[in-house]
Each structure stands twice: as structure tokens, then as C-alpha cells.
Amino acid sequence: MPGIDKIPSQIGMLMKSVLIVEDEILVAMDLERILEDAGYRVAAIVADQKEAMSTAGAVDMAFVDINLRDGATGPEIARDLAKRYGARIVYVTANPAQIGEPAENAVGCIRKPFNEAAILAAAALADPDQQDAIGHEDVIRL
């Protein structure tokens, strides 16, 4: 995709903090690697609602799975993070229909399985400082 190669260098200058809400550790570690390689600071990886609310703190954005260790709590976690901290939300799920009413600051959804370019495009979309964020066919804008 033209222009996709410039996303990491733009992101790298920003050092935004990210919370990863994902109960599949290999998926979470893949997200962490992609985001950290692009210059983001991953604040934490959490696997359920209790961990998310006790660990979250003020983060700039969150990548949130829908079905977690404690059930389909992702949408509620996303709403809480958006309301309490103003976090921009990117849902990461195999079934976007389960999102229901998106969180106030939800910007998009990425279908699993995902690729690195989709994650970087979604991160740029979730960053209010990215005026020229590049879209990606695997990112569903909300």
C-alpha cells in the first residue's frame, strides 16, 4: 500500500502510551512487539476487566479484545477507559458484531487475525496528533 512505510517513523516520534486488553498471550505479545517497534510505550497487558481497571491509569489509547478471560467484557472495559481516561479505543476481535454500541472514543476495529500494517494504521488513526493518518483495508472505522 503506498505510503504505509511512513507510518512507523511518524508514530515513533510521539511516544503515546497504550494498554493492551487481550487474554491470548501470544496475540498480546505480537501487539506489544508491533507497537513498541513503532515507538509506542505499552503501559501494560491485561487479560480481564479486573486487571484492566486496576492497571489502566491514564493511557492515550487501548487495543481491546471483546471476549476475554472473564467473558465478553471488552466493550464495557472500552467504555470505562474512554470515560475515565479519555483513551482512544481500537477493538481487536474476530467478530466485530459483538462490539455493540462503541465506546465514546472508539476509532476503529481490526479483525483477527491481523497484520502489522493494520495495527500501525489503527494506532495512527487512534492518535489525535496524526492529522494525515493512512487508512488500511483491514481497519473498520467506527
What are these model-derived regions, one by one?
Residues 64-82:
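Conserved phosphotransfer microenvironments
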Residues 22, 93:
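Conserved acidic carboxylate
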Residues 101-111:
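As written
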Residues 84-90:
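His-Asp phosphorelay/catalytic-motif detector in bacterial-type signaling
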Residues 1-17, 111, 115-142:
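Non-catalytic signal-transmission and effector/linker regions of two-component phosphorelay proteins
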Residues 25-44:
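Two-component/phosphorelay signaling modules centered on CheY-like receiver
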Residues 2, 45-61, 69:
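Acidic, metal-coordinating helix/loop segments flanking the phosphotransfer/catalytic sites
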